[in-house]
């Protein structure tokens, strides 16, 4: 019986090569590998070919020994007790009851309004997948802000109303008109990367003014300014969602554990699209310990220390900007954003001294650099470096 040809029609941009089998380099039945540089492009969703992926601190990389570009905690916390890993051969609970209970006790939000996720990033994606129709619906953001809202939307072919914050980094006067029609309206508070905050009353106005949208308040850094949280408004407003994470104040960025807080109707929809096992057993164990009384006490102590070091760094940056031109925004998270008239000079100064901070391509942040708060040792070096530039 004759064998049909592998390819009856010529294919463009295709390379066919022979790969020796594992048994013998001279085996006549060598494996045939067809390589095509355009196969993925031909099969991919067209909108993804134009998508620029989110440039995380890890993707951007850098060289140095002081890493203050990702708003990570300098504290490498070990577990406060023994981890129970005796069930690693079994799939974990979708929503580990002990973890949900621990976060409920910490946040004051009832368990039925909590979903645990792989960081707040997954929660953002879940909301877009659950509520936005690709090619039809849109989200709204107020920038400059965290880039993953827009990236997640674009990944699912959901439109983005990229609105601007006011000159004072608050919600603009026409926010309700500008955001109207968006299924999801994202407000980052404290805002990343500016570190600025929006008053609780102003956010409540937004929730009231957009009854047909879900207002998503990202509180990733709320432990640094808890008085600005709107989690207590969940009982009042069915269109409010609050995002939280253990990556920042709890120093568990590597664990990837976040929470979505919302009314039960929204939670029920989210649970329809969430992965069956989103929280690995070791992550749940570590997170539960972080949310124990001892873990929370440690977090609060570390937040206080980070705020102290942040105040020192902000003061040094202010002195530099007074002499060389620029401005420093008042920090409310574990980072501070400074705008420099001589930003290229500052960037080189940091690079030459092994310091990796965060710069931006956004035109609104062309002169800005964000500095994460770090240890006393790191802060000593930063303060000394900027003080050495005195005229």
Curated annotation (Swiss-Prot):
Pfam families: Aminotran_1_2
The entry's keywords: Amino-acid biosynthesis, Aminotransferase, Histidine biosynthesis, Pyridoxal phosphate, Transferase
The protein's required cofactors: pyridoxal 5'-phosphate
GO MF annotation: an example: histidinol-phosphate transaminase activity
Catalytic activity field: L-histidinol phosphate + 2-oxoglutarate = 3-(imidazol-4-yl)-2-oxopropyl phosphate + L-glutamate
Pathway, per record: Amino-acid biosynthesis; L-histidine biosynthesis; L-histidine from 5-phospho-alpha-D-ribose 1-diphosphate: step 7/9
ATP-binding as UniProt keyword: no
EC number(s) per entry: 2.6.1.9
Family in the record: Belongs to the class-II pyridoxal-phosphate-dependent aminotransferase family. Histidinol-phosphate aminotransferase subfamily.
Assembly notes: Homodimer.
Protein name: Histidinol-phosphate aminotransferase
Organism: Shewanella oneidensis (strain ATCC 700550 / JCM 31522 / CIP 106686 / LMG 19005 / NCIMB 14063 / MR-1)
